[in-house]
């Protein structure tokens, strides 16, 4: 979703002189739909019919019920895009049909697909989806052609992204990206709201948290206070008639200092540290390798945020670009290039963007293993194929399950989608050759196909917005991948032992059948006994209940069978 509307590389000045559009949609009681500043202004008196921060719900099954109709995130986002489209058409005096849309770098495949769907609903042909930090780097690179490595720190209203980008020789290459899709300026506002609620409860004995209208007024004042504290050390919050009681009307009149605000939000600022460190690590760089730190997003105006970046990176961040507008500026330049509207030979027309996929993609193989085909921070577009085979004898179909995440086992990752490949030629386990291909386009949208190389049969799936990873799940996946890595490795060894035991059991059964008339009676009896013992151990050790003791028993029995068969 976009918050600014641009034409060429010039900001589109809307009616009333505004340069940005709040992502707010409201429905009046007379069933009119309003978007942007007007929707935001009426929120206090119409809070239950006003929708904020829809970006956080993209790609989920969230629904908003208004007048008996359920609206999807795609539809609500489309209303915002329609408003931007109308503003651009008014500014240009001609129809607008194509657009480049920016999204948080950590948006999942489902969220990107949902964004494309919103564009379609709005009547726009989405030429390209660009990651917001990449778009900001494009805007920065236009006037800074020298080779350099840039860290883009993008803290917006609802999301946080950080990307490490290499700029040079007319190429803008994303080396790594990280982020938190549930951290932004809205969370800073909420801390002020909670503080005001607690202070009012202490002073007046009234809990405002259940009063929808009062809470909306608090949110509006909290946002104003946050902005004022970016340039002042104190601000006054005055809300007359915020509540009524038997004693009469109650008012809020509180002075909030920047120091108190910083204390209320210190943990939010600290949450940006780990994504920065992760991005640097994945890029193979240290903070001393970074030539420039670019602040993007209105929330980077918070002094404590800039101080943290300065402390973390050891250098003064750049303020050359307007943090509210640079993402849209980069998108406009890319749109001009894709639409062949840039002057030939200009710096903008020569620039090439190379972005990455934010999370690893895998399929489930025997034992619940997440077999990765594409690693996180792989440059897109990309295509990768790998040969797999069947796990059972005479198997005529396979289920392909696609996962996103960084853990070794699929149970700890997010299922994106699944499909079945039928018509596999009957054969012993391990004989069929099944080619699985992952294809990620320039928008970061995934297509997965599976082909039986023996029969030529093929099946594919494009991951849609019905399946997705939430913001919390992505952050949790990255965190757990590091915390539980040793635990995962240990369990992986148990899985390997079990799979080896199953393979040995199959080989022993096949050998017994093939040598029924050759082996002596005692050897056949011994092999049958060992097969029975190993089979029981395997059956008592399902994959989800493995432990060190069961793995050791299977390994010992498996080795005994191998020794007998030698």
Predicted feature residues:
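Oxyanion-binding/catalytic loops of NTP- or PPi-dependent enzymes
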Residues: 3, 7-60, 64-70, 79, ...
């Amino acid at each position: 979703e976009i918050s600014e509307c641009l034409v060429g590389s010039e900001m589109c000045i809307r009616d009333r002189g505004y340069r940005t559009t709040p992502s707010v949609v409201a429905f009046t009681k007379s069933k009119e739909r309003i978007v942007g500043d007007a929707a935001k202004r009426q929120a206090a008196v119409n809070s239950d019919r006003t929708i904020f921060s829809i970006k956080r719900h993209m790609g989920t099954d969230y629904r908003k019920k208004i007048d008996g109709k359920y609206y999807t995130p795609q539809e609500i986002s489309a209303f915002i895009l329609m408003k931007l489209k109308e503003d651009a058409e008014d500014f240009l005096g001609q129809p607008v049909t194509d657009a480049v849309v920016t999204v948080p770098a950590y948006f999942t495949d489902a969220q990107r697909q949902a964004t494309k769907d919103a564009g379609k609903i709005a009547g726009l042909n989405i030429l390209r989806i660009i990651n917001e930090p990449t778009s900001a780097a494009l805007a920065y690179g236009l006037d800074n052609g020298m080779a350099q490595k840039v860290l883009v720190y993008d803290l917006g209203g609802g999301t946080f992204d950080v990307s490490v980008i290499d700029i040079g020789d007319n190429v803008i290459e994303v080396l790594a990206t990280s982020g938190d899709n549930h951290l932004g300026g809205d969370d800073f506002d909420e801390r002020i709201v909670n503080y005001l609620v607690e202070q009012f409860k202490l002073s007046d004995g009234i809990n405002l948290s259940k009063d929808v209208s009062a809470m909306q007024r608090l949110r509006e004042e909290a946002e104003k206070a946050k902005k004022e504290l970016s340039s002042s050390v104190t601000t006054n919050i005055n809300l007359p008639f915020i509540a009524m009681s038997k004693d009469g009307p109650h008012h809020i009149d509180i002075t909030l200092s920047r120091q108190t605000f910083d204390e209320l939000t210190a943990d939010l600022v600290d949450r940006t540290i780990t994504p920065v460190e992760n991005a640097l690590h994945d890029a193979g760089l240290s903070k001393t390798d970074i030539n420039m730190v670019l602040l993007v997003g209105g929330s980077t105006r918070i002094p404590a945020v800039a101080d943290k970046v300065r402390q973390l990176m050891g250098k003064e961040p750049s303020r050359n670009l307007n943090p509210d507008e640079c993402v849209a500026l980069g998108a406009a330049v890319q749109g001009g290039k894709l639409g062949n509207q840039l002057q030939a030979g200009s710096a903008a027309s020569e620039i090439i963007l190379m972005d990455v996929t934010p999370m690893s993609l895998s399929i489930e193989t025997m034992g619940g293993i997440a077999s990765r085909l594409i690693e996180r921070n792989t440059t897109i577009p990309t295509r990768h194929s790998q040969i797999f085979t069947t796990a059972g004898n005479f198997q005529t179909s396979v289920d392909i399950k696609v996962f996103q995440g960084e853990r070794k086992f699929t149970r700890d990752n997010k299922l994106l989608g699944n499909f079945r490949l039928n018509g596999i030629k009957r054969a012993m386990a391990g004989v069929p050759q099944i080619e699985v291909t992952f294809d990620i386009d320039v928008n970061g949208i995934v297509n997965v196909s599976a082909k039986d190389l023996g029969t030529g049969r093929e099946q594919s799936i494009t991951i849609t917005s019905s399946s997705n990873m939430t913001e919390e799940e992505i952050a949790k996946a990255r965190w757990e991948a590091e915390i539980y890595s040793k635990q995962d490795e240990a369990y992986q060894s148990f899985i390997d032992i079990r799979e080896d035991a199953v393979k040995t059991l199959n080989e022993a059964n096949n050998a017994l059948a093939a040598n029924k008339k050759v082996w002596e009676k005692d050897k056949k009896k011994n092999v049958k006994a060992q097969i029975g013992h190993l089979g029981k151990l395997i059956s008592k050790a399902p994959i989800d209940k493995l432990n060190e003791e069961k793995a050791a028993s299977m390994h010992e029995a498996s080795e005994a069978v191998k020794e007998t068969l030698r």
